[in-house]
């Protein structure tokens, strides 16, 4: 992209002359290419990493609420020390959604200056493990990714179910993924946002003191009925357009009451 942009800016180049001949708005083309390259790094070529900034760029629905938690995450990420975030909450409370909302805010420059050029990548541990056959292969792949990340100041890595890092790849004679990660976090070579449930945090994460002290905790409580109602009000238009129907506020309130009565093993806002 950078090479293409440089060629297009050179008004005496053949490329510029050809595009002018076909009445292409070169300035608009340069703008679009610059916008696209703003969300890209060499990490886009790695299949186990997903560029969340790019993923949410064309998302049609908005993510509502959690302003206090987002502010807390931004404050932690902007700190000089202990600037890694660990989001704790039950399944369905919106841990991944809050990271997507942060990426949306970065895209629209709605964050503090220190976060304005950041790109968030999700590291898929399952994809990383799936391609391994031999002992030590997982650790080798994991370390290669981390080595590439540490050279990029504008990258934040998001690891969902981060408790799986503790013990991942660990076998007799092998080191687990958390032991690879710890030195990089200690030297502040990279920034990580992790997400896990409350049970898994106490079961795995809290016991690993060296790993635990590298992170600042952000707890995501289950949304109340009132908060869930506001979320549903904000997103109902997308369902109305898709199904060609109208959903009244009365129906939304009834829906929340019904799921509260009949669905006990899930949490708001996911179950609504």
Place the predicted regions along the sequence by residue.
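Histone-fold recognition with a strong bias for associated Lys/Arg-rich disordered tails
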Residues: 1-129, 139-152, 158-164, 170, ...
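Structural beta->alpha junctions
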Residues: 130-131, 223
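Short, glycine/polar-rich helix-capping loops at beta-to-alpha or helix-loop-helix junctions
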Residues: 200-208
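Conserved AAA+ ATPase "SRH/arginine-finger" region at the nucleotide-binding site
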Residues: 204, 216-229, 242-250
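An amphipathic alpha-helix signature
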Residues: 225-236, 252, 256
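C-terminal helical "lid" subdomain and adjoining coupling/linker elements of P-loop NTPases
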Residues: 241-250, 254, 258-272
């Amino acid at each position: 992209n950078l090479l293409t942009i440089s060629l297009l800016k050179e008004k005496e180049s053949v490329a510029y002359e050809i595009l002018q001949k076909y009445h292409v708005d070169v300035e608009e083309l340069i703008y679009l290419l610059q916008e696209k390259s703003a969300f890209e790094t060499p990490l886009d070529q790695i299949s186990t990493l997903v560029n969340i900034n790019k993923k949410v760029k064309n998302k049609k629905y908005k993510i509502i609420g959690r302003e206090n938690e987002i502010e807390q995450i931004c404050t932690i990420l902007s700190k000089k020390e202990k600037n890694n975030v660990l989001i704790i909450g039950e399944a369905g409370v919106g841990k991944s959604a809050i990271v997507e909302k942060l990426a949306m805010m970065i895209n629209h420059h709605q964050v503090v200056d220190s976060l304005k050029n950041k790109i968030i990548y999700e590291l898929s541990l399952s994809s990383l493990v799936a391609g391994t056959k031999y002992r030590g292969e997982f650790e080798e792949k994991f370390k290669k990714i981390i080595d590439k990340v540490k050279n990029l100041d504008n990258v934040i890595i998001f690891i969902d179910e981060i408790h799986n890092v503790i013990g991942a790849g660990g076998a007799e004679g092998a080191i687990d993924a958390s032991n690879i990660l710890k030195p990089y976090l200690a030297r502040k070579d990279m920034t990580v946002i992790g997400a896990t449930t409350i049970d898994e945090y106490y079961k795995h994460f809290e016991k690993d003191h060296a790993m635990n002290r590298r992170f600042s905790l952000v707890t995501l409580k289950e949304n109340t009925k009132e908060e869930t109602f506001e979320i549903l009000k904000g997103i109902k238009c997308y369902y109305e357009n898709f199904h060609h129907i109208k959903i009244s506020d009365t129906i939304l309130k009834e829906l929340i009451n019904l799921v509260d009565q009949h669905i006990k093993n899930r949490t708001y806002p996911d179950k609504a």
